[in-house]
Amino acid sequence: MNDITDPSLTTPRAMSGRGNRLSADDWAQAALDLIAEQGVGAVAVEPLARRLGVTKGSFYWHFPSRDALLQAALERWEIFEQKEVFGSLEDVPDPSARLRALFQLVAHEVKPHVIYSELLKALDHPAVRPVIDRVSQRRLDYLIASFRQAGLSRTDAQHRARLAYAAYVGFLQLSLQLQQPKQAREDFEAYVEHVIQTLIPG
């Protein structure tokens, strides 16, 4: 993934056109930004309040606890994927073209994947594991269905979906956790095209 950041997952500006009032969504998005930067363990009320330029009272207006905020942040991330990723592909009728569009979309949206990588490090957290399980299963189911529609048998579609997902998670590990050198843009684009040509039928 390169350095293109999706505008739907950017930090809210405190006191932007609403005085000093922030919504619950603003707090949830700020928590996601902090997860992307420092991990789940960094989510806390005081640093988020400082980041947003408000008092802790604004937080407690919307959430009873830090755990409630974390749950809202995870739900926001999950809903974003359902609507902005899978939802954006509903109008692509050809299954192979839909898979190609999915691979390109996933390759060029950075922040959701950084968040996912950080969540994988926190699977022992009781709020994180159920979300990761749902998201991972939904992704695999979508891939299996798409590969089936593209002409593969059920068994081959399952194998291809797992291979595609393993390539995705493995790339995250190499890029974000093992901190391999960042690829030049042309090299990255060539890699994405190679993955597409290797995994997508026809």
What is the predicted function of each stretch?
Residues 109-133, 177:
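Amphipathic alpha-helical segments used for helix-helix packing
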Residues 72, 83-116, 164:
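Hydrophobic alpha-helical connector segments
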Residues 26, 30-38, 84-88, 118, ...:
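Solvent-exposed, amphipathic alpha-helical segments
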Residues 131-138, 142:
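Short, solvent-exposed amphipathic helices
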Residues 1-22, 152, 202:
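N-terminal intrinsically disordered/low-complexity leader segments
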Residues 129, 133, 148-202:
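Hydrophobic/aromatic-rich alpha-helical bundle segments in the mid-to-C-terminal region
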Residues 63, 70-77, 84, 131-132:
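Alpha-helical DNA-contacting segments of helix-turn-helix folds
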Residues 26, 30-72:
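Helix-turn-helix
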